[in-house]
Amino acid sequence: MAIRSYRTYTPSTRNRPISSYDGRVRSNPQKKLTSGQHRCGKGRNSRGIITARHRGGGHKRLYRQIDFQRNEKYIFGEIVTIEYDPNRSAYICLVHYGDGEKKYILHPRGVIIGDTITSGPRAPISIGNALPLTDVPLGTAIHSIEITLGKGGQLARAAGAVAELIAKEGRSTTLRLPSGEIRLISENCSATIGQVGNVNANNGTLGKAGSKRWLGKRPRVRGVVMNPVDHPHGGGEGRTPIGRKKPVTPWGYAALGRKSRKNNKYSDASILRRRK
C-alpha cells in the first residue's frame, strides 16, 4: 500500500504520513471466523500484578482466527477479500476453498483478489502457496514458517517480513530470518512462499498521543523522574543524575548491551548465528 499525508488541519495531522487503505481493503470480518477477547487488566497476571508495563486501555477488538497451519492440502482456494486486522500489522485474506471451507490467512505481498492458492507437498512454487521446506528451492523468499511440525507458522509473520532459505543439509534446512539470525529448521516444517504484505506499515507516524492509547499503549515514564522506591535512577532534588556509572533497568540489570536471552535454552543448538 502507498503512503499518503494528511492535510494540516490540526497539529496532530501536520506532515503525518500513514498507509493508504484503497478500496480493496475491508474492515468488516466474517462473523464465524471471529471471537471476543478478554481485555480486563491489560498487562496484569492472574493476581493483578503488572507483568508487562505500559499496557492498558485501547479500542475493543474482535480476534480474527488465522489459519497458520494451512491444513487444506491439495485443495485450491480463491482470495475473496483483503481485510484490515487490528491485532497485527499485516493485512489478512479471506480464502474460499473448493470444499466449502472459509479461512483467513496472512496477506502475501502481490496477491490480489481472485488469485488462487493451495498447500501441500509438491505444490507449485508461487506466491501464497504453502509447502514443506524440503520442496522449496534455495534462495526462495518465504514467511509464516513452522518451528515445530504441525504447530503452524510462527516465524516471519509481521508486515513486510521475509526469510530466505539458504541451505539444505540432511534433515535440516538453514534459514536467514528477518532479524539476521541464521537457524536450523526441520525440512518437514512448512512455510508460505513470498513476503508478507503491507510493507509500508512502519513508515507511518501516529501523530499524537491519543493514537497510541487507541493501540493499548500507555505512557513510558523515565526512571530519573521517579521516586527511589520505583526505580534505581529515582530520587534527588531537582534535575539530578542517575548516580551510577551506567543506566540500569527498574530491576537493577544493566540497561545497555546486556543480553536478555536466557542461557542453555533448548533452541540454542538450532541457532547458528544470533540476531543482530
From Swiss-Prot:
Its main location: plastid. Signal peptide: none annotated. The keyword Ribosomal protein applies. GO terms for cellular component: chloroplast; mitochondrial large ribosomal subunit. GO terms for molecular function: rRNA binding; structural constituent of ribosome; transferase activity. Residues 1-51, 224-276 are annotated as: Disordered. InterPro entries: NA-bd_OB-fold (IPR012340), Rib_uL2_dom2 (IPR014722), Ribosomal_uL2 (IPR002171), Ribosomal_uL2_bac/org-type (IPR005880), Ribosomal_uL2_C (IPR022669), Ribosomal_uL2_CS (IPR022671), Ribosomal_uL2_dom3 (IPR014726), Ribosomal_uL2_RNA-bd_dom (IPR022666). Keywords: Chloroplast, Plastid, Ribonucleoprotein, Ribosomal protein. It comes from the Eukaryota. SMART domains: Ribosomal_L2, Ribosomal_L2_C. GO terms for biological process: mitochondrial translation. It is found in: Plastid, Chloroplast. PROSITE patterns: RIBOSOMAL_L2. Belongs to the universal ribosomal protein uL2 family. Part of the 50S ribosomal subunit. This is Large ribosomal subunit protein uL2c.
